[in-house]
Curated annotation (Swiss-Prot):
It is found in: Cytoplasm. It is an enzyme of class 2 (transferase). The gene is acpS. Belongs to the P-Pant transferase superfamily. AcpS family. This is Holo-[acyl-carrier-protein] synthase. It holds the Pfam family ACPS. Transfers the 4'-phosphopantetheine moiety from coenzyme A to a Ser of acyl-carrier-protein. HAMAP family: AcpS (MF_00101). It comes from Saccharopolyspora erythraea (strain ATCC 11635 / DSM 40517 / JCM 4748 / NBRC 13426 / NCIMB 8594 / NRRL 2338). One of its GO terms (cellular component) is cytoplasm.
Amino acid sequence: MIVGIGTDLVGVVRFGESLERTPALAERVFTPAERRTRDGAARSVTSLAARFAAKEAAAKALGVPSGCRFTDCEVVQADDGRPSLRVSGRLARAAEVRGVTAWHVSLTHDAEMASAFVVAEA
């Protein structure tokens, strides 16, 4: 059963400018693992923008619990390569209350826009 659906669209250039203007923003929004690729290289702004969109989409799918931190939602890569979410803190509690047992995540981006679509399933 679908518990919630969320989507978000992020302007890559504007997001990159925000990261440049406020270097600590990346640490407040992304976990250390999200800021790096599997081989340890820094993620591109485009990739980070897509992950930010996924965090926003996940919050929308659950109705944005108050007091949530962006790092309560981590975009991870499943064993088969698909993106997925690992939730913690208040977001995890909200997901548990709503009976969420699985997350379905789709990310896409080009040079200008990044988008995410998230389905919370029970």
